[in-house]
Amino acid sequence: MALKQLAAAVALALSIQAAQGAAVKEKRATCSNGATVGDASSCAWFDVLDDIQQNLFNGAQCGAEAHESIRLVFHDAIAISPALESQGKFGGGGADGSIILFDDIETNFHPNIGLDEIVNLQKPFIQKHGVTPGDFIAFAGAVAMSNCPGAPQMNFFTGRAPATQAAPDGLVPEPFHTVDQIISRVNDAGEFDELELVWMLSAHSVAAANDVDPTIQGLAFDSTPGVFDSQFFVETQLRGTAFPGSGGNQGEVESPLPGEMRLQSDSSIARDSRTACEWQSFVNNQSKLVSDFQFIFLALTQLGENPDAMTDCSDVIPISKPVPNNVPFSFFPAGKTMADVEQACAETPFPTLTTLPGPETSVQRIQPPPGA
């Protein structure tokens, strides 16, 4: 989805909003809990919200279950290929919930290894509340992200029909893929460009690896995995010095901090001339991080769908807490300085950041979901 398409889409959305403002206001409904929503059908999702916040996300925490729910959104949605369709083959349904409906097939695909745990955790909620898997994946991902301080106001639309067949294998990027391969894949999936690829990877701000290193799970990608901030974009540009576990694993390269995982793909995209400046642009720029991820998350959750036929239930999604104010938006972890930065953007210098005081930062493991 090129930036000119984004600009056109925003302009169209604003014109529609202006033209239909009065009608939307009249359509708003009040739910039994007193909340006001844009469409009465959204009210049913408050029961789902209360249930998953307590029983899936452990009291609205930005923990392992939230991280894996966000990951599941991408792995379900990106499995769509117009290129395959043009060859007369089934190209996948995008954000249709096929990874849950056909989990015996899709969770065995190599890039989806480990997702069977969150799929099994989500299934009972889908059955209990009678919603479609595609809608639930998008909802759980939006709620999960809202549990992470600093996250944007997440959007959520309903209307996804159940998937009719499993997505083909080979459509989810792997951490050992080249930058060319990954850019090509996301461009095929949704006409996303290299800048929008970087926006997608903002999700790694609140993420961890459970299966890249088979000897250790819950390895975070940055030192603040419970906060949606730009530390991921800072720390991926620091010189790698060691592996957090066994090392030598496919798709892993050295990281700068003890206990931190660095994916080969993240390292490569952070240093590629096509993406390095966009990567660096998020450092110390929380507002850009928030707005770009808000857009790309919605775009991902509508892959394979007709947005005009969907219902906006974003009113149900909680508003995230702000980033804690006891530390800067971006900083060098204790023990790191500008000398550790591997400058990749040729257009602008790396921002000047404060180094946190104290002994060298060591990143704590995130407890994986039950059964992992």
From Swiss-Prot:
Q: Does the keyword tRNA-binding apply?
A: no
Q: Summarize where heme b binds, as residue positions.
A: 204
Propeptide segment residues: 22-28
Q: Which reaction does it catalyse?
A: 1-(3,4-dimethoxyphenyl)-2-(2-methoxyphenoxy)propane-1,3-diol + H2O2 = 3,4-dimethoxybenzaldehyde + guaiacol + glycolaldehyde + H2O; 2 (3,4-dimethoxyphenyl)methanol + H2O2 = 2 (3,4-dimethoxyphenyl)methanol radical + 2 H2O
Biased-composition ranges, Low complexity, are 352-361
Signal peptide as annotated in the record: 1-21
Spell out the PROSITE patterns in the cross-references. Answer: PEROXIDASE_1 (PS00435), PEROXIDASE_2 (PS00436), PEROXIDASE_4 (PS50873)
Disulfide cross-links: 31-43, 62-148, 277-345
- Glycosylation site list: 285
Q: Which UniProt keywords apply?
A: Calcium, Cleavage on pair of basic residues, Disulfide bond, Glycoprotein, Heme, Hydrogen peroxide, Iron, Lignin degradation, Metal-binding, Oxidoreductase, Peroxidase, Signal, Zymogen
Q: What class of enzyme is it?
A: oxidoreductase
Q: Which pathway, per its entry?
A: Secondary metabolite metabolism; lignin degradation
Report if keyword Transmembrane helix is assigned. no
**E.C. numbers:** 1.11.1.14
Which residues of this UniProt protein bind Ca(2+) 1?
Answer: 76, 94, 96, 98
Entry-linked InterPro entries: Ccp1-like, Haem_peroxidase, Haem_peroxidase_sf, Ligninase, Ligninase_C, Peroxidases_AS, Peroxidases_heam-ligand_BS
Q: How is the cofactor bound?
A: Binds 1 heme b (iron(II)-protoporphyrin IX) group per subunit.
Please name the GO terms that the record assigns under molecular function. Answer: diarylpropane peroxidase activity; heme binding; metal ion binding
* SUPFAM superfamilies, per the entry: Heme-dependent peroxidases
Membership in a protein family: Belongs to the peroxidase family. Ligninase subfamily.
Give the protein's biological function: Depolymerization of lignin. Catalyzes the C(alpha)-C(beta) cleavage of the propyl side chains of lignin.
What name does UniProt use for this protein?
A: Ligninase LG6
Protein source organism: Phanerodontia chrysosporium
